[in-house]
Amino acid sequence: MDLRLLGIDNTPLFHTLHHMMEAAGEDSVNAPSKIYVRDAKAMAATPADVKEYPNSYVFVVDMPGLKSGDIKVQVEEDNVLLISGERKREEEKEGAKFIRMERRVGKFMRKFSLPENANTDAISAVCQDGVLTVTVQKLPPPEPKKPKTIEVKVA
């Protein structure tokens, strides 16, 4: 099936999945690789809200139970914002055992294509009360070009 017909060929998830499928090689076209499955689960398990303001873009991601050292925010090539990290399983204390374990553990990742007017030198990230807020400032709009007057000389 050609995913371009669905209109999802220009999304970060599509590009990530396409890259992983190419990297897997032609020997395993019919079976997804462990890396593909791991990364797809990591992206699906990390929902995010993205807001646009007049001067910035704001990414809000739920990160319950994580410390700032467990979260990594990076800008990759081609203006791609990468939010990743790992939720670690709580160590069992002696004499205690889990009856039920429902909280997610493992690696997580989200990639977002930033617009051309995103200022990748002005990014801040704050994690408070289990919510990560990444703010990307916008570049100022380019000033309109003023007409240049060229002096005409008499020959």
Curated annotation (Swiss-Prot):
Superkingdom of origin organism: Eukaryota
Keyword line: Cytoplasm, Stress response
Record's keyword annotation contains Transferase: no
One Gene Ontology cellular component: cytoplasm
sHSP domain span: 39-155
Cell membrane in keyword set: no
Membrane-spanning ranges: none
Family: Belongs to the small heat shock protein (HSP20) family.
Protein name as it appears in the record: 17.3 kDa class II heat shock protein
Organism whose genome encodes this protein: Solanum peruvianum (Peruvian tomato)
